[in-house]
Amino acid sequence: MAPVVKNEPQHAKILAIGTANPPNVFHQKDYPDFLFRVTKNEHRTDLREKFDRICEKSRTKKRYLHLTEEMLKANPNIYTYGAPSLNVRQDICNIEVPKLGQEASLKAIKEWGQPISKITHLIFCTASCVDMPGCDFQLIKLLGLDPSVTRTMIYEAGCYAGATVLRMAKDFAENNKGARVLVVCAEITTVFFHGLTDTHLDILVGQALFADGASAVIVGANPEPEIERPLFEIVACRQTILPNSEHGVVANIREMGFNYYLSGDVPKFVGGNVVDFMTKTFEKVDGKNKDWNSLFFSVHPGGPAIVDQVEEKLGLKEGKLRATRHVLSEYGNMGAPTVHFILDEMRNKSIEEGKTTTGEGLEWGVVIGIGPGLTVETAVLRSEFITY
């Protein structure tokens, strides 16, 4: 009797990526005029000078936001610092977050090339709204997914969660035969928009960086030949909390919306720990230290100083974080979706420039998510050869 040949399970792979943004584009050079006009702070020249400097240092050229001047005029409590406005903010986000997620999902599904009925799992991640049933439930309806799709909803994880969802999708795909996981991260930062005040200057930093966006990633193991074209293999994941950094990024749900605090120590915390968490991440792969310059990177750009610290402490050559800096410049900090935008930019640029792999011609790479805790979540990726 001939031996039975079994298909060995493979690591989960990213099979498609889709992204979406609201239609409203805000150029950074014009944003200070907009912000101080709509919040009725044009007389605050001292604060305006400070905000101008923050915008100049942000290295962000433009962002996409759902919020418009007309919405603010209709809802003045949103731009009045401390005024109760949680209800109207949540009413906006509970509708718009699933819709933006739907737009990104349809792009990913189109690239994937498989019937939508083959999606078995859905992970939805947002920090913008907290209704029950949640955005996962709403997206099931918007996309017409099977009501028996296994859903997981992640609320209020923050900016590191773009890597978290890859870890979860990997587990689902590798432990459920034939699973195809739709991962969606979507943020509408209307909940974080505030009027200006002398007592809470962190708001100025958020106003210069935060933006709206959604990403959708389809993950599965054992891709179907000639139908599914993998982009990246998810090899290993690791999460850690940086010591004594709890105050670094904090957000609280209050009647005034989501009140947040951003410590100037965050770049220092990341820079002081990046070699350690990178070393421990790659120990899970082969137990060896990597030449960091041999990797491709998708680093959550919580701000330019964080990106600079990662580059400096790892001794990266100029241009190693090109994709990260490009997304920060063209989209701002969109929270969890941002690292997926970076991977999308990277694979597109790799194809455009005739590279051999989706990871800028390199084999190994890493996604670094950074957020409240301070929590760092890393995902080791292996690129795929470009054959199209």
Swiss-Prot record:
Its EC number is 2.3.1.208. The active site is at C159. One of its GO terms (molecular function) is biphenyl synthase activity. GO terms for biological process: 2-hydroxybenzoyl-CoA catabolic process; 4-hydroxycoumarin biosynthetic process; coumarin biosynthetic process; polyketide biosynthetic process. PANTHER family: CHALCONE SYNTHASE, HYDROXYMETHYLGLUTARYL-COA SYNTHASE. Type III polyketide synthase involved preferentially in the biosynthesis of 4-hydroxycoumarin from salicoyl-CoA. Can also use benzoyl-CoA and malonyl-CoA to produce 3,5-dihydroxybiphenyl as a major product and benzoyldiacetic acid lactone as a minor side product. Can also use m-hydroxybenzoyl-CoA as substrate, producing m-hydroxybenzoyl diacetic acid lactone as a derailment product. No activity with p-hydroxybenzoyl-CoA, CoA-linked cinnamic acids or acetyl-CoA. This is 4-hydroxycoumarin synthase 2. It comes from Sorbus aucuparia. The gene is BIS3.
